[in-house]
Amino acid sequence: MKTIRYILMLLMLTVTSGIQAQLYQDNLLENVKGKVKYIVYSRNSKSEVVNFSQDGKIQRSDIINPTYNKYGYMTRCQNLLYGTYCDKTYEYKNGKLVKECIKTGDGTAITEYIYNDDGTVRDEVHTITVNGLSKSFTLSAQYKDFDKQGNWTRRIISCNNKTFADSRVILYWE
């Protein structure tokens, strides 16, 4: 009888702890920590909202047929980019997104992410290849403000002697 109670208690703990666990690691795609509910990005006069479910899955209508590995990292999806379908793949290392590859009928866009010690993206190295011709450029970030969770809320991006400001507001699941 004691064994049955013990097994039932373990089963209940397993079920309830699984409910609270974050199953998906899609927050890595947006370089945020914590249980994020949504992010509102602003650059110049344009803004974009990215939503997440309570289990950590990104909620975007332009992400189609996502594939996940056993750790909850999105590894592949189809994406609607400027009205054209493309294939996206993602590579991770040490719990960070390190490479994103977008393939379309005309070419490939590869982004490699280089991180600061605090986990923020220092540089994004972009290589775009169309019809066999390649062009590379680097976006470098300088972070200005962070929220209580340690996620950046304001940064300056530099590329080829041009700068622009990014800001974001992040709401978290409780």
Where are the predicted features?
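Bacterial Sec-dependent N-terminal signal peptides
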Residues: 1-24
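Buried hydrophobic residues that stabilize the cores of well-folded domains
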Residues: 22-174
